Amino acid sequence: MVSFSYLLLACSAIGALAAPVESEDTSFNETALHEFAERGGTPSSTGWNNGYYYSFWTDGGGDVTYTNGAGGSYSVNWRNVGNFVGGKGWNPGSARTINYGGSFNPSGNGYLAVYGWTTNPLIEYYVVESYGTYNPSSGGTFKGTVNTDGGTYNIYTAVRYNAPSIEGTKTFTQYWSVRTSKRAGGTVTMANHFNAWSRLGMNLGTHNYQIVATEGYQSSGSSSITVY
């Protein structure tokens, strides 16, 4: 979780941002919370909230406030940040059908995406629903397209070398599906993306977490998302 590297030369990333959590502790570290509160930010944390897995990571730059809401809802407000990513979903991930809605308003670089990891092989994946000033279609290796959920997604791969991951510093592959028409609500049929990737030789492993994530890099903005 640090840097879109190859795919985003100027962007640090949703990738490797938050390691999985073994417990279901939903509380933030009080000392860290106090320290970040003085700077107007929320500390990094992962866990469970109202029946959903959540992950929030920040490099500590700028001002970013992540708030877990009722059910599958969360909100993020950020100003002049370095890099952060956060959201709600499930652990483990699966080929589920995801419904979500809300608002996503970045000023600068940002993503709204279904984001997750698998192990054996170690894969970091994104189904990008919307983005800010940087279009991830600009980078990576184009593999094909998939038509699903009322839109077309371009499929890409990229490789991260010696980068942070849920297994520590590793070299691993990223899989991307990037929607050509931006949106901030609807249905994401993950089985259709996974099947399309598989047909292209892009195989997944054992699922770790899977969230509907908001990410920002050197930008400002706001996001309010509910996962169903």
UniProtKB/Swiss-Prot annotation:
Active-site residues, Swiss-Prot/TrEMBL: E124, E215
Signal peptide segment: 1-18
Gene3D superfamilies associated with the record: 2.60.120.180
Main localization (coarse): secreted
EC number: 3.2.1.8
MF-aspect GO terms: endo-1,4-beta-xylanase activity
Gene Ontology CC terms: extracellular region
Pathway: Glycan degradation; xylan degradation
Residues listed as glycosylation sites in the UniProt record: N29
Major enzyme class: hydrolase
Compartments where found: Secreted
Domain GH11 intervals: 40-228
Catalytic activity: Endohydrolysis of (1->4)-beta-D-xylosidic linkages in xylans
Alphabetized UniProt keyword annotations: Carbohydrate metabolism, Glycoprotein, Glycosidase, Hydrolase, Polysaccharide degradation, Secreted, Signal, Xylan degradation
GO biological process, one term: xylan catabolic process
Family note: Belongs to the glycosyl hydrolase 11 (cellulase G) family.
Reported function: Endo-1,4-beta-xylanase involved in the hydrolysis of xylan, a major structural heterogeneous polysaccharide found in plant biomass representing the second most abundant polysaccharide in the biosphere, after cellulose.
Name assigned to this protein: Probable endo-1,4-beta-xylanase A
Record organism: Neosartorya fischeri (strain ATCC 1020 / DSM 3700 / CBS 544.65 / FGSC A1164 / JCM 1740 / NRRL 181 / WB 181) (Aspergillus fischerianus)
Taxonomic lineage from the root: Eukaryota, Fungi, Dikarya, Ascomycota, Pezizomycotina
